[in-house]
Amino acid sequence: MYRALTRDIEVTVDPYYLEEQSDPDDDRYVWGYKVVIANNSDVPVKLVNRYWHITDQNGQVDEVYGPGVVGEQPQLKPGDSYEYSSGCPLDTPSGLMFGHYEMETENGEVFNVTIPAFSLDSPGLMRVLN
């Protein structure tokens, strides 16, 4: 499990390999990841946008930026947490992901919350990127 803390907002990521959706013979490797965002601060925040930086084993980079996560822009009051799962396909057996969430407070202040870097490793594969 991977963790990052920004302004008392904790992001935890737990990646896992999806063998049933992967096909190594066709250079298709798929991972899922569960994210928990916990607002341990004393101010409500809204997740407005997400940014992902995804690097495969060959150094190929894909950047993803867009509104919310899994079609939602959750609002987290102090003490609230939000959990979602998503996935990432790659053409190589390993990779690395990191990024940030763009959060907004009730008074309109926008700030970035770090998503920790985490590795995507196929089972039985020596770790290449980390």
From Swiss-Prot:
<dbReference type="InterPro" id="IPR007474">
    <property type="entry name" value="ApaG_domain"/>
</dbReference>
<feature type="domain" description="ApaG">
    <location>
        <begin position="3"/>
        <end position="127"/>
    </location>
</feature>
<dbReference type="InterPro" id="IPR023065">
    <property type="entry name" value="Uncharacterised_ApaG"/>
</dbReference>
<dbReference type="InterPro" id="IPR050718">
    <property type="entry name" value="ApaG-like"/>
</dbReference>
<protein>
    <recommendedName>
        <fullName>Protein ApaG</fullName>
    </recommendedName>
</protein>
<dbReference type="Pfam" id="PF04379">
    <property type="entry name" value="DUF525"/>
</dbReference>
<dbReference type="InterPro" id="IPR036767">
    <property type="entry name" value="ApaG_sf"/>
</dbReference>
